[in-house]
């Protein structure tokens, strides 16, 4: 014991001399359990009783530290539990050190609570008095929940197996049927008193009485205490104080704060100057040092306060209840209905030691171990070991019940709103709505797992015959057909409005899913619906013609795509067009989908079907080019290289055209054997076709399966009137004011050949050509050009600048068209239809009205687009020639595709970068002298040098 007036040891290692002293007490030993909360490092709750553990003490969960003061009948049993901050920190560290296990706060909290309940149940059965220590200043309401769990655990578990298990042990005979010493009294010790209240006797007593009333009402309301000891979990004294506030002693002083306070007191200077009022009072004193005594009332009050501080201690507070137990009035002072036979059992030290050893083994030390399951065959005890913690986890059951309700609500909301067939975006939307319905009731730790379960259930419901195909169209719209049901053709349900090749008739087109459907089948179907498309003859672009049924899409090198086709032409293109940027090589190719016999993707919309426009194309046969030449990707470059060499650079206002002498007409028939064979580089493949559109880096000799461009003469130049613009019966769907072509005056100067043209062949020239040559070498060509844009709603409009929509005749200036043709035009532009959604219009047609002059207009469009910078061309070996005094329309592809993948249109265009989606390169027009000896209906079989000689405007 040393300098201390008490003994302390760890259970069950009781020293022999202490055991001898306890044996001398006989059956007058009162056991007091001290349990609750602590904040000190040693987890000590005995400081209020003036006791401390040894210096080398290490707190451990479930450890019992015994204290005994000689000369008393009180054995204090200190319980170290998870409510002590030191032990709670140890448990947190152990949990965090577990590898691969994330810290689950809810599960950790439930485990700590269950361990504390076990220790409380042990104290409930082996102690006469329980002292609950609280570090706060108010009663912790969560303690009521702990008492309820204790009552539930005792009534549903402990009472079921303790009587039978203790029956054959000495503890069973001593404890009786209730298996406990008595209904223990519970006392509440608050280590700290509120600083706002004064520490006088009246203030402290008032606070204690108020807290007692609150605790009594709570415990009575939840039936923790009743009028009968047999049905009460705990007991409260009727006429004695059971709440103690430590108002005078600082139990766990902070050494650092104390040092700071002492330092402040030492540094504080005492002001000894007396006030003026005090000096006036002192002048009335008969002599210096004269004072008046406080009087008898002050001395009595001061003595009573000192006496109250001396007697108001936790030890005196406890001993009043110990005396009730020793005097035998323990139950009488706690319950109104006193049992016939006294329940209080006062045991000697050895008997009590046997009882606590047996109960500690059953409730704490062996709980949850496999050995106890094998040794003790009691069924109720095995249930206790396996499901005790789970049965106390009422919060988990509560959250699980709420999540179960929320799960049903979420699944019901999903199924109720789900259509017959829907896609992934609709599934995600319905799932979000189901999650909101779940969150109306479901919450807590199991909510995440319940949402995952709901997600899996909804996914199974979606995949059970309700899943949409979702094959994306070329416009990124998903197919709406059922995924599990076979379907020959995809259908997104999105309908676009587009015009035919000539632009006269508009029709509904389904969202295309293949390049053939987008660029060929729709327009072939519209030919049957348009009375103008049926009459005109279109320029035939070169396409792939297989020699057998075994043909396939061309396969490109993965590492170096288009290397063989492009490495020679890149140098030529760099020489011919140094301003053009290098083309990036594509990385693959995509197979074209199977050809469908019927498309059924459109229906006529235009009211002009069958109108009174009965124009004949007789007399325009010379201008209708029907050519199928062998494909050469460098044809554009070759054509440029065969130009006359003179251009508008020689004059700011004139275009110089070098005239040649008329060719001598051979009257004799041509011998087929005398025709020179075409170069080997013009030979086209008959086994491999080009899967995409023709571009400048396409492999030599590869042709597409179908033409994606269209070039047609829709009538004479007199069809268009610049005063009225394009009429609705001829070109439908144009916005008001945006239906005018731009006039383009090209000043032309003819340069004759060195030889005189008045030779024997002169009579073979046409009269019109002779008239032009007679009337002078200078002429002005009147050309009308229009760049037409069309949106998916069928709105059509012309542009007067790359960033401006034509708004009528006021936007047409003298040099408007000249600037347009020499400027890159954006492939996409926002439609001015002012709809809610920002529809992008696409450059779909180029209108050209050729002049009445002995020249041919040449068209050589090049569309540059895609992140790989594809430059798409017509695919002809030589650019097509347009006949004189005619109205020509060049339709551009609806969808662009390179060798590897589709080039999708942009979702949105930035105003400062309208060329981001692609653009039509400037300088697509050229001019060449009309040669009456050439048959433009059969350009493919004419000499390349003859057709390719022109001057680029």
From Swiss-Prot:
Bias type Low complexity, positions: 634-653
**Compositional bias of type Polar residues: which residue ranges?**
595-604
* One Pfam assignment: Smg8_Smg9
Swiss-Prot/TrEMBL GO biological process terms: nuclear-transcribed mRNA catabolic process, nonsense-mediated decay
Transmembrane keyword on record: no
Comp. bias regions, Acidic residues: 573-586
Which keywords annotate this record?
Answer: Nonsense-mediated mRNA decay
Q: Which domain of life is it from?
A: Eukaryota
Residues that span the membrane, as ranges: none
**Residues covered by region (Disordered):** 571-604, 629-653
Homology family: Belongs to the SMG8 family.
PANTHER family annotated for this entry? AMPLIFIED IN BREAST CANCER 2-RELATED (PTHR13091), NONSENSE-MEDIATED MRNA DECAY FACTOR SMG8 (PTHR13091:SF0)
Per the entry, what this protein does is: Involved in nonsense-mediated decay (NMD) of mRNAs containing premature stop codons. Probable component of kinase complex containing nonC and recruited to stalled ribosomes.
For this entry, the protein name equals Nonsense-mediated mRNA decay factor SMG8
Species of origin:
Drosophila pseudoobscura pseudoobscura
Q: The organism's lineage?
A: Eukaryota, Metazoa, Ecdysozoa, Arthropoda, Hexapoda
């Amino acid at each position: 014991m040393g300098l201390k007036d008490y003994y302390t040891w760890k259970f069950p290692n009781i020293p022999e001399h202490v055991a001898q002293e306890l044996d001398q007490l006989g059956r007058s030993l009162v056991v007091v359990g001290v349990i609750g909360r602590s904040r000190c490092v040693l987890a000590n709750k005995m400081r209020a009783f003036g006791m401390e553990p040894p210096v080398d003490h290490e707190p451990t969960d479930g450890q019992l530290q015994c204290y005994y003061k000689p000369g008393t009948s009180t054995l204090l049993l200190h319980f170290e539990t998870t409510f002590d901050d030191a032990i709670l920190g140890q448990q947190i560290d152990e949990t965090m050190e577990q590898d691969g296990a994330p810290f689950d706060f809810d599960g950790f909290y439930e485990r700590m609570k269950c361990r504390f309940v076990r220790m409380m149940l042990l104290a409930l059965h082996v102690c006469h008095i329980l002292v609950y220590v609280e570090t706060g200043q108010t009663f912790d309401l969560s303690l009521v929940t702990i008492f309820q769990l204790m009552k539930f655990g005792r009534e549903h578990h402990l009472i079921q197996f303790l009587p039978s298990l203790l029956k054959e042990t000495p503890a069973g005979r001593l404890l009786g049927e209730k298996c406990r010493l008595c209904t223990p009294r519970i006392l509440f010790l608050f280590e700290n008193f509120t600083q706002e209240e004064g520490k006088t006797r009246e203030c402290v007593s008032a606070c204690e009485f108020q807290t007692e009333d609150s605790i009594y009402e709570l415990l009575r309301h939840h039936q923790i205490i009743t009028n009968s000891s047999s049905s009460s979990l705990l007991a409260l004294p009727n006429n004695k104080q059971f709440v103690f506030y430590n108002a005078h002693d600082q139990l766990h002083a902070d050494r650092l704060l104390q040092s700071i306070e002492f330092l402040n007191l030492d540094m504080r200077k005492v002001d000894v100057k007396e006030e003026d009022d005090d000096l006036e009072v002192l002048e009335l004193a008969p002599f210096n040092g004269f004072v008046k005594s406080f009087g008898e009332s002050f001395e009595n009050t001061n003595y009573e306060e000192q006496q109250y501080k001396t007697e108001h201690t936790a030890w005196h507070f406890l001993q009043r209840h110990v005396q009730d137990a020793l005097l035998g009035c323990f139950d009488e002072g706690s319950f109104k209905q006193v049992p016939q036979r006294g329940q209080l059992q006062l045991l000697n030290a050895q008997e009590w030691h046997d009882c606590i050893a047996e109960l500690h083994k059953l409730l704490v030390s062996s709980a949850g171990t496999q050995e106890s399951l094998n040794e003790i065959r009691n069924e109720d005890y095995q249930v206790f070991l396996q499901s005790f913690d789970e049965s106390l986890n009422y919060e988990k059951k509560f959250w699980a019940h709420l999540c179960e309700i929320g799960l049903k609500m979420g699944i019901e909301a999903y199924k109720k709103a789900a259509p017959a067939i829907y896609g992934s975006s609709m599934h995600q939307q319905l799932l979000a709505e189901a999650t909101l319905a779940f969150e109306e009731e479901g919450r807590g730790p199991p909510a995440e797992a319940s949402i995952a379960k709901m997600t899996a259930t909804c996914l199974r419901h979606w995949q059970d015959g309700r899943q949409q195909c979702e094959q994306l169209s070329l416009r990124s719209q998903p197919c709406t057909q059922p995924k599990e049901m076979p379907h020959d053709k995809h259908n997104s349900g999105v309908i676009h409005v587009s015009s035919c090749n000539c632009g006269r008739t508009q029709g509904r087109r389904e969202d295309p899913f293949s390049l053939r459907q987008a660029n060929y089948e729709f327009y072939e179907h519209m030919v049957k619906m348009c009375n103008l498309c049926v009459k005109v003859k279109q320029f035939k672009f070169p396409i792939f013609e297989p020699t057998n049924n075994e043909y396939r899409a061309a396969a490109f090198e993965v590492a170096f795509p288009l290397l063989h086709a492009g490495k020679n032409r890149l140098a030529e293109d760099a020489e011919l067009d140094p301003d053009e940027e290098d083309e990036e090589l594509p990385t693959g190719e995509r197979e074209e989908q199977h050809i469908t016999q019927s498309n059924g993707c459109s229906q006529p919309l235009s009211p002009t079907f069958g109108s009174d426009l009965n124009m004949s194309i007789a007399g325009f046969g010379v201008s209708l080019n029907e050519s199928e030449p062998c494909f050469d990707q460098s044809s554009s470059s070759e054509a440029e290289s065969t130009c006359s060499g003179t251009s508008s650079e020689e004059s700011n206002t004139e275009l110089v055209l070098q005239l040649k002498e008329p060719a001598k007409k051979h009257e004799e028939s041509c011998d087929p054997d005398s025709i020179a064979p075409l170069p080997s580089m013009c030979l086209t493949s008959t086994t491999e076709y080009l899967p995409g559109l023709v571009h400048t880096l396409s492999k030599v000799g590869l042709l597409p399966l179908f033409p994606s461009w269209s070039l047609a003469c829709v009538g004479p130049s007199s069809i268009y009137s610049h005063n009225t613009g394009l009429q609705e019966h001829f070109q439908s769907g144009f916005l008001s004011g945006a239906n005018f072509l731009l006039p383009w005056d090209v000043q032309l100067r003819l340069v004759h050949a060195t030889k005189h043209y008045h030779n024997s062949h002169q009579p073979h020239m046409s009269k019109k050509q002779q008239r032009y040559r007679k009337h002078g070498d200078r002429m002005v060509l009147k050309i009308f050009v229009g760049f037409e844009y069309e949106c998916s709603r069928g709105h059509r409009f012309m542009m007067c600048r790359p960033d401006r929509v034509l708004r009528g005749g006021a936007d047409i200036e003298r040099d408007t068209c000249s600037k347009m043709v020499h400027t890159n035009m954006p492939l996409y532009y926002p439609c001015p239809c002012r709809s809610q959604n920002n529809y992008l219009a696409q450059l779909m047609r180029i209108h050209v009205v050729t002049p009445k002059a002995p020249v041919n207009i040449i068209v050589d469009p090049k569309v540059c687009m895609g992140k790989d910078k594809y430059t798409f061309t017509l695919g002809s070996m030589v650019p097509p020639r347009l006949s004189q005094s005619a109205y020509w329309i060049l339709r551009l592809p609806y969808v662009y595709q390179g060798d590897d993948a589709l080039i999708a249109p942009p979702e949105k265009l930035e105003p400062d970068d309208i060329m981001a989606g692609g653009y039509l390169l400037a300088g697509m027009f050229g001019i060449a002298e009309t040669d009456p000896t050439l048959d433009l209906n059969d350009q493919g079989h004419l000499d390349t040098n003859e057709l390719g000689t022109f001057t680029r405007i």
